[in-house]
């Protein structure tokens, strides 16, 4: 049985106007653009989408706009992360009613709970939300590194645990997800959250990634994915090296959201570079460095 979710998924940025209100037209445009450029799925209300800066109503509105824009062409898998378990449940049920394809959830990110309490948190959500759910490990922001053993327990006990997104730099962690959890549940998706690990994770037996730069240039990620899946390792390596050149954007920017928004701006997209405070737009100097990368790779709308 193949994984429920796979390939190239974008953690959707949230476009804002200069007054930091939602830019609904840009949301719809960007969702259509990503679908046309080859993403398999879109993850609104994400880390890159500044979900911690959105009200519940805004999270629902962005997800609704994305659903309408893509019209069923790609998966829509919104985030339901919250510090209170029942808030995640309520948001998941709301998204279920909207017609989404799944959901993504991180650990609580304020109180650092024990593995036992973390299992209760995820189990409650998996039991109460009737959707395929990706459990997202991002210790840099949550302060919690989800043990591989916990994924295994959840995978055995909850058939709607669809997989793991892991934003970690450890090859060992991904190897264990594949060899321990995926060996138990063949339909368990192993997804990287880091653009530059896409090919290594695929080669270890993973299924793809949910990567920030897929907001702007998912065609490069697709080139890596498609070449590897077709058995053309030479072409996959060439595409991966192109992706590694694009990843330099992160070397200059101050955050994932602003790096992507700046890249889209210099590519000519109708997406403004504004982010909600304490994040702020990148400086003109950073913008020019990112523009140079885009020019080198021939990226323009």
Swiss-Prot record:
Enzymatic class: lyase
Gene designation: dapAL
Domain of life: Archaea
Pfam assignment, any one: DHDPS
Molecular function (Gene Ontology), one example: 4-hydroxy-tetrahydrodipicolinate synthase activity
Cell compartment(s), UniProt: Cytoplasm
UniProt cross-references to Gene3D superfamilies, sorted A to Z: Aldolase class I (3.20.20.70)
Catalytic site: 47 (charge relay system), 136 (proton donor), 165 (schiff-base intermediate with substrate)
The protein's assembly and partners: Homotetramer.
Name the UniProt record assigns to this protein: Uncharacterized DapA-like lyase Tpen_1666
Gene Ontology cellular component list: cytoplasm
InterPro entries associated with the record: Aldolase_TIM, DapA-like
Similarity remark: Belongs to the DapA family.
Keywords, in A-Z order: Cytoplasm, Lyase, Schiff base
EC number(s) given by UniProt: 4.-.-.-
């Amino acid at each position: 049985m193949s994984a429920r979710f796979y390939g190239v998924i974008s953690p959707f940025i949230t476009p804002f106007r200069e007054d930091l209100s939602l830019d609904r037209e840009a949301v719809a445009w960007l969702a259509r653009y990503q679908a046309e450029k080859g993403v398999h799925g879109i993850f609104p209300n994400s880390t890159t989408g500044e979900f911690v800066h959105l009200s519940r109503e805004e999270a629902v509105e962005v997800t609704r706009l994305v659903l309408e824009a893509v019209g069923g062409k790609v998966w829509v898998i919104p985030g339901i992360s919250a510090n209170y378990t029942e808030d995640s449940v309520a948001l998941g049920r709301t998204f279920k009613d909207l017609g989404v394809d799944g959901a993504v959830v991180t650990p609580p990110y304020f109180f650092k709970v024990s593995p036992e309490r973390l299992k209760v948190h995820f189990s409650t959500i998996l039991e109460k939300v009737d959707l395929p759910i990706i459990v997202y490990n991002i210790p840099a922001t949550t302060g919690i590194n989800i043990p591989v053993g916990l994924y295994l327990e959840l995978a055995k006990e909850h058939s709607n645990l669809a997989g793991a997104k892991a934003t970690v730099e450890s090859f060992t962690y991904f190897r264990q997800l594949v060899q321990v959890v995926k060996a138990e549940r063949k339909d368990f998706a192993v997804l990287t959250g880091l653009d530059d690990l896409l090919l290594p994770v695929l080669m270890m037996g993973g299924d793809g990634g949910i990567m920030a730069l897929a907001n702007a240039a998912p065609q490069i990620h697709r080139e890596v994915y498609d070449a590897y899946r077709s058995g053309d390792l030479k072409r996959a390596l060439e595409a991966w090296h192109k992706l590694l050149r694009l990843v330099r954007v992160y070397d200059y920017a101050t955050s994932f959201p602003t790096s992507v928004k700046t890249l889209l701006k210099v590519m000519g997209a109708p997406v403004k570079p504004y982010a909600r405070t304490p994040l702020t737009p990148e400086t003109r100097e950073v913008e020019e460095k990112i523009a140079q990368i885009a020019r080198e790779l021939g990226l323009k709308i």
